[in-house]
Amino acid sequence: MASYSVNDDAVAHARKLIDARQYVLDSDWGDVQPRADAENTFLESHSWDEYAQWHLGLTDGAADETKARYGFVYGDFRRIHRSGLIACHYRAAEWRHKDVELAAHDLLQLLDRKAA
């Protein structure tokens, strides 16, 4: 099983999106999560650093500037999705990636406070 570390740049990006109210509170993550074609389209006009900002986890040992390096996507490359944070939290907890789980939890709490 892969191991992950928290992507601090992604956490900071998510916080900025929440502060700017760039979020979706009600969405079906299964329908809106970025698919491979959306990721490829994003990478055609954005840097790997910008791509990385949408992923809470960095795969330990994976090469930089590869999709394998980034895990736990939380938004649609435009806005953060509450359902995406819930999915990140759930998956990280399920596979015992505690640091990513806690980062997703903290962001979810922040989002809920700001959106209240």
Can you say where each PLM-predicted feature lies in the sequence?
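A charge-rich, low-complexity, intrinsically flexible signal that marks solvent-exposed coils, linkers
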Residues: 1-116
